């Protein structure tokens, strides 16, 4: 605990909050172009082939983003919308691709949580 004199001499440092998604540059989403679409394996206790894409954003950053849902139509040069949100078992993946926006199609045959996967209401 500092004394009053110590506080007069040197004031307290302000705590700076570090962004969890710096590549979005204070925007809710960013548009980008897929440069590589591939699968990768998760960290130790889990086992799968997770679908990810390397995306060059309009902000100039190149990020790895996760493609959620079953099946996708993305390939190189696809235009996608990227939002924040990390994948806990994939190191370095801090972004999600928004399904149902731009070139990323919605998940077909989805009946629950449709809004998260860009699926229209079934007739």
From Swiss-Prot:
- InterPro entries in alphabetical order: NA-bd_OB-fold, Ribosomal_uS12, Ribosomal_uS12_bac
Spell out the PROSITE patterns in the cross-references.
Answer: RIBOSOMAL_S12 (PS00055)
UniProt feature, compositional bias: Basic residues: 10-20
Q: Which Gene3D superfamilies match?
A: Nucleic acid-binding proteins (2.40.50.140)
Alphabetized, the UniProt keywords read: Methylation, Ribonucleoprotein, Ribosomal protein, RNA-binding, rRNA-binding, tRNA-binding
Which CDD domains did the record assign? Ribosomal_S12 (cd03368)
**Function as written in the Swiss-Prot or TrEMBL entry:** With S4 and S5 plays an important role in translational accuracy. Interacts with and stabilizes bases of the 16S rRNA that are involved in tRNA selection in the A site and with the mRNA backbone. Located at the interface of the 30S and 50S subunits, it traverses the body of the 30S subunit contacting proteins on the other side and probably holding the rRNA structure together. The combined cluster of proteins S8, S12 and S17 appears to hold together the shoulder and platform of the 30S subunit.
Protein family membership: Belongs to the universal ribosomal protein uS12 family.
Cite the record's note on assembly: Part of the 30S ribosomal subunit. Contacts proteins S8 and S17. May interact with IF1 in the 30S initiation complex.
Q: Mind telling me what this protein is named?
A: Small ribosomal subunit protein uS12
């Amino acid at each position: 605990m500092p004394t009053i004199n110590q506080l007069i001499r040197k004031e307290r440092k302000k705590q700076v909050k570090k962004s969890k998604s710096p590549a979005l540059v204070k925007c809710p989403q960013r548009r980008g172009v897929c440069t590589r679409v591939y699968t990768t394996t998760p960290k130790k206790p889990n086992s799968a082939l997770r679908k990810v894409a390397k995306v060059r954003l309009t902000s100039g950053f190149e990020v790895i983003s996760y493609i959620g849902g079953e099946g996708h139509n993305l390939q190189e040069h696809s235009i996608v919308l990227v939002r924040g949100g990390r994948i806990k078992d994939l190191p370095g993946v801090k972004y999600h691709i928004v399904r149902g926006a731009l070139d990323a199609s919605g998940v077909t045959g989805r009946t629950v949580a449709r809004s998260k996967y860009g699926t229209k209401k079934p007739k």
